[in-house]
Amino acid sequence: MKKVKSLKGKTVAIVGMGKSWFDYNLAKSHGVHFDEVWAINAVADVIYHDRVFMMDPPSRFLDTDDAGGQTDSMIKVLKEHKGPIYTCELDDRCPGLVEFPIKEVVSDTNCFYLNNTVAYAVAFAYWNDVAVINLFGVDFSYKGNLHFAEAGRACVE
């Protein structure tokens, strides 16, 4: 995959499902401009966006209920979205999937700490020379077991 030249020097909002995603909505309602908005997973079913990052295999949503509450939203996104939806593997049932350019990103940027979807989106922005990255909703906390997955952080240290 080649770099997306139109991203160079741009301002991007990356929006995940954590509590601070409401701050994205507040920013937009107060006139804050982003050249592009990138949705993480099921946020793609809720807000306007230009790109989706979903580093789970599509089969996780299409063939299982492993994603819990995200399952129905992601099935809709995967079957209807024209893309790009950057992911780890392609699936013929999903028209908008684009395989994430992992080799190019790692080789060109020396970014190796890619352990969740937000980190992949940030690395993609870095690889494409995005000037400003605004993170919303990447503060992951879960009811019951407050920080069981990402330890409450976006893993983009």
Name what the model sees in each region.
Residues 1-157:
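Metal-ion/cofactor- or nucleotide/acyl-coenzyme-handling active-site neighborhoods
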